[in-house]
Amino acid sequence: MTKTLIIMSHPDVAQSSSQQFLLAAINGEEQIQIRHLEAILAEREDYHFDKTIERACLQEADRIILQFPFYWYQCPSVMKQWMDEVLTLNLLQKGKKKEFGIVVTVGAKKDRYTAGGSVGFGIEELLRPYQALANQLGWNYQTPFVIYQFQYLSESKKQQLLVDYLYYLENGSQQFNEKEQWMLERMGYYENTHTQQVREWIVELKQEREELVMMLSEMGNEADGF
């Protein structure tokens, strides 16, 4: 089973509704390890990371995820410290490449992060340095998973976010067919561990898939008539 390592940085996780939601989502996920950088540093007398421990965690993981709030278009300072102290070209991957993804929470609206928005750049462009980092270390860079204005999401949107987040942690890809298959494989697990809204969303996803297949089939039949 794929092992996912989440490197999380947030100065006040206890007061962050988005981070608490994401932590609850991975509760019980044995293949996912999370390291909260601020909590780790709080236990270090010299306020520096143990390079041996951190690098061992990286080496054992198949998929590495950096998770953080977007502060002035970059990660929190503690995550930057972790990168400065832990990452080295000696981690350059040989053989099967690790996958490397970004989970970032943004307080502003999505339309601000466009060429015509107030920021003037898209999120993916602003996160480009992390892609360069992945390239240097020989990791496969995944499309970032961006959460905009979590506090304004409806309950149904949050439940959809929960499933999308778990899928991203395990698979990275957002192909519809792949996600549907993954959902069906894990349906029994969700029935026992997550909310009724998630279970209902799974059923809706399956129904939408069936309707899409039927519609495409009908379109094909109509084309055959010409």
Language model features with spans:
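A short acidic, helix-capping loop that chelates divalent metal ions and anchors anionic groups
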Residues: L41-E43, K110-T114, Q149-L153
